[in-house]
Amino acid sequence: MYDAIVVGARCAGSPTAMLLAQQGYRVLLLERGSFPSDIFRNHALLYPAVAHLQSWGLLDAVIATGCPPITQFSQFMGDFNLTGKLHLPDGLAGIYAPRRKYLDQILVDAAVKASAELREEFAVQDLLWEGDRVVGVRGRSHGGASVEERATIVIGADGLHSVVARCAGAAALESRPTLTWIYYSYWSDMTTAGVEFYRFDDEAMLAFPTNDGLHCVATFGPVDGFSDYRTDIEANFARTLARVPDLAARVAGGRRAERWIGTSDLPNVLRKPYGPGWALVGDAGFHKDPVTAHGISDAFVGAQLLADAVDAGLAGRRPLAEALAAYEAQRNAEAMPVLDGACIAATFGPLPAEMLGLRQALRQSQDDTDQFVGMAVGTVSPMEFFAPANMGRIM
């Protein structure tokens, strides 16, 4: 009998397991895959993610992988490049965009070090119930017999297509249409100047440095164009890239080091994150378009919130259901603005005149430009930046 079973050992599950194990709870951490391994997911460690890694004592391990700090963000929106410097507090060197085979290994190692019990290549097939309460899981290891494990709470950190969410019947509190598709790969022997974002009315590109001297270059567009794009990825990527001559020249001077990775399975959904004996964290409970790159940051924030709530309940400081209700309230309050922002950013078409005017005004002040790009990485509050007094000063 465990205090908690965490299903999924990636960016949401491993930190949740680590934090609970550090409080002395008996935690079973289950992962369908194995480590180290890359997965199709976001790379970005925005400021909230970097700050959590620092507080957990794991940032140095990420830096030790050789992933370079990112200190600059350039944004081209069909008009001109607007480049801002990133100013992170607490002496942090920058944000990072590590390969998941490195980041996920660091996170799962930290969970195991904290005494969580890890089982890799274990597929959860169903939940165990007593009345209306979840009391455990049923699943099997690779090639093994079906087994059952029981716990006070089962936490689903198993991503967008969460088995825990499905079996628990987690309702969608908010569901919006899929807006975009994405394809990306990695290049060697080229350069990027921090994060480079290029948006046109009908498609966009993104480039940034990652581990092993590689640079990720991504292209994305409206979801209704996905079928056509995937028929000839090379030709369509070249066509998009030609719209950014400087980036095209750098890509041409490099070498694509890995296969193309892409999907249009990018729904925008906010699920009920708890019920009797179960809870959700990370993409299992909240998935949004990746254009804002908030996924890992939200997973880390959610892991801390949920671990604190579960600890409060298991330790008897408050009823577990009450603690989980507070977790939901705080998660929803933070998630809704992110969901709204992601859906706006993922909607292609001409930019509003107000945004074009703001960009023109920002060209007159590097400090204001730095604050503007700071919103993208989590160091600046959009409410503060877009406050009437601040807009009046800038415009």
Task: Name each region found by the language model.
Residues 227-310, 314-315:
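FAD/FMN-dependent oxidoreductases across multiple families
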Residues 12, 35, 161:
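Conserved Rossmann-like nucleotide-cofactor binding loop
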Residues 5-7, 21-41:
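Glycine-rich FAD pyrophosphate-binding loop
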Residues 1-12:
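Beta1/beta-strand and adjacent pyrophosphate-binding region of the FAD-binding site
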Residues 34-54:
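Conserved N-terminal glycine-rich FAD pyrophosphate-binding loop of Rossmann-like flavoproteins
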Residues 110-247:
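Predominantly flavin-linked oxidoreductase catalytic cores and closely associated redox partners
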Residues 54-105:
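A conserved beta-strand/loop capping segment in the N-terminal third of enzymes
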Residues 311-395:
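C-terminal helical "tail/cap" subdomain of flavin- and related membrane-associated enzymes
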